[in-house]
Structure formats: C-alpha cells, structure tokens
Design a protein with these regions (language model features):
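SIR2/sirtuin-family catalytic core signature
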Residues: 1-19, 33, 43, 254-336
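Short secondary-structure boundary/capping segments
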Residues: 22-35, 167-172, 205, 290-291
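Acidic, metal/cofactor-coordinating or nucleic-acid-engaging core segments within structured domains
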Residues: 56, 208, 214-268
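Short, flexible loop segments at the rims of nucleotide/cofactor-binding pockets, characterized by
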Residues: 123-132, 248-255, 280
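Extended hydrophobic/aromatic segments used for targeting, binding, or gating
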Residues: 160, 164, 168-201, 285-322
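Gly/serine-rich nucleotide phosphate-binding loop at the start of the catalytic core
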Residues: 1-149
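Metabolite-binding pocket within alpha/beta catalytic cores that recognizes anionic/polar moieties
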Residues: 19, 127-187
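Covalent nucleotidyltransferase
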Residues: 139, 187-191, 208-218
Length: 336
C-alpha cells in the first residue's frame, strides 16, 4: 500500500464564481461586484429591498457606494474603507470617522448580501450539473481515496456553498473551531462565515452598530449552522474582502489562522497543495503569504486553478517553490 499523503486546498472567491457559472446563476449572483445587487438586498428590520442606500448606509453612500458602479470602482471604495479599518487597531482610541462608520455598514451589508444570495439560489436543484463539476468529482475522489490521509480546505469565502455541496453529496466534513470530531475533510474559515452565529437580536431592534466590528471576540461566542441563516447576529464573524484578519485582531480569526499555520508547516514534499481563485489583493496578501511561506519549497504537487492568475502571485509562487502548475479550471484536477 502506498504511503498516505495530505492535501491542502486554499479557496478564494473564484471557487464560488466557478460554481455559480456551472449552475448557470452568474447573472443572478454577482460575486465580482459586491455592490451590484445592493438595491435588492433586504433591510433585515423590514425585509424590504434597498440595504445599500443613503437611508440605510449613509456613510458608504457618501463615499460613493452605488449598486450601479462598475466592479473596478466598487472595489476601489471597498479597498479604501478596509485600508482604514486595517490601520485602526494600532490606535488606542476609535474616533468617529466616516470610513469607520462605513466599515461597520459594509460588514453588516455583506452579511445580508450573502444570506440573500444563499436564499436566492438553491444548489440542490442543480445537483445534476454539480455532479459533473470538476471540483465535485475531485472532492469525492479525495474522500474515497484510502491513500489520502487528510484534506484540509482553507476557505476565504463567507458563503456556505462549499459546505452545502459536501452535504448534498453526503461527503463528511468538519469545521475548525466548531466540530467536536475532525473528519478527513476539515474546513478552516479564517475570514469568517455567514454560518458563524452569535446571540440574536430581535428583528425590530436591528441596527448597524458603532463598535461591534472592532471589538474583540472569541470562537466560543459563536456556533456553526449553515442551514438556518439570518442577519440578526449581535456580533458578525466576518472580515470584509481585502481585510487583513491579522491586523483586525479578532481572537476567533487568530485561533483559526494559527491552526492553519501549524498545518501548513507540517506538510511534506509528497503532499499536495491546490490554490483556487485567490485574488491576492495588496491588502490581503499578508495572510496568504503567511500560509505559503510555511510550506516546504520542494513540495512536488502544487497546482493553481485560475483562468487569469494574478501575475504577482505567480511571481511569489516561483520564488517560494521549486515547481508548480497552473490550470484554467477544475476539469483536469483529478488527473493531476
């Protein structure tokens, strides 16, 4: 019997984009421009559309956030807000600034956006299409292969489509920080998730808080549930896109990141690493670098799945590793 090996998978937004493309929902679920559906996202108190509006997000709106912006302008505004939030923990006092208020609005908006997206698309109705998707085949193969000891998936996505996919095909998994037992497939979510629930507030009392986004919280303040989603958490466990989770100093995220670092350091040259759909923006690459730099440089099986991989990430991989392969989609994953 061949010696068992481990598989480390790092998933970015491209994984979810590919899934929506596979089931024909890319037009309804816009993951490239997070403001595009803002006028349709319901305000939790009233459940009426218009979360992204001057009425509900006056600070984001004042900074230029609009549902009709193109994705480049939308990303520019998000990066401005997050860059200010990243620097904030270095100050002893939080001042009442528009970018800080906008950050709170952005975090609450993203929670509502991804809950809205999840309710809008029932992936179980696309089981036939997903059965033939490269990622589904690959994950099923890994789970069934006795030569694979562990499959560690680091997901930088808030959504629960990965978990719902595994549930749909009866593939066991566990969630780091929440599961009492560790399955062969173990998922780490250092950027948080809409499935991380805290104490709930009454719907009629819903509002955007002034400070909760920056207060420190621990993993044991949350529970995991990917089926019963809502937007009524008193505390949201989300690090907005382009946010540096290490600088925002959230204990729940730090615990998960530390587990990933230890995991990356234990990889051997005969193990496999798969990187999919990672943007590698300048404000979030520090976290990714932390994981990559812990891996052995002589690892034999390193694959990046991305139709348009960032050149700067290519440069980093060439610097850190002796070899790697780039493939445009998941079709050939099982052959590598």
């Amino acid at each position: 019997m061949a010696s068992q090996k481990n598989v480390f998978i790092l998933l970015g937004n491209g994984f979810s984009i590919d899934m929506m493309k596979t089931i024909g929902k890319s037009d309804e679920i816009n993951l490239n421009n997070l403001f595009a559906c803002g006028a349709d996202v319901p305000w939790p108190e009233t459940e009426t559309p218009g979360f992204l509006s001057f009425q509900n997000c006056p600070n984001l709106w004042t900074l230029g956030a609009r549902p009709y912006l193109d994705k480049e302008l939308a990303l520019e505004i998000i990066e401005e807000v997050i860059t200010c939030a990243n620097i904030l923990p270095q100050r002893t006092e939080i001042k009442d600034k528009i970018y800080i208020r906008a950050y709170n609005e952005l975090e609450q908006y993203l929670m509502s956006l991804f809950v809205y997206y999840t309710r809008k698309v029932d992936i179980t109705k696309a089981k036939g299409k997903l059965k033939s998707w490269g990622w589904t085949k690959y994950l099923r193969q890994l789970n069934a292969d006795s030569n694979i000891k562990t499959v560690s998936i680091v997901s930088l996505n808030y959504d629960v489509w990965l978990e719902n996919l595994l549930d749909m095909f009866s593939i066991p998994y566990s969630i780091d920080g929440f599961s009492s037992t560790k399955e062969k497939i173990h998922i780490y979510k250092p950027q948080g998730s809409i499935a991380f629930h805290s104490t709930k507030r009454d719907r009629a009392a819903y509002s955007i808080p002034d400070r909760n986004s920056f207060d420190n919280h621990k993993l044991d303040e949350f529970r995991y549930d990917n089926k019963n989603l809502d937007c009524l958490n008193i505390i949201n466990a989300l690090i907005p896109p382009a946010g540096d989770s290490s600088r925002l100093k959230q204990s729940w995220s730090a615990d998960i990141r530390n587990h990933i670092k230890v995991l990356a350091k234990t990889l051997k040259k005969d193990d496999s690493v798969v990187i999919c759909g990672v943007s590698y923006w300048h404000v979030d690459r520090k976290e990714i670098d932390t994981y990559l730099s812990e891996m052995p440089s002589d690892i034999k099986h390193l694959v990046m799945v991305n139709p348009n991989p960032p050149e700067v990430l290519n440069a980093v991989l060439m610097t850190l590793f002796d070899q790697y392969v780039v493939i445009p989609n998941s079709t050939n994953l099982m052959k590598l």
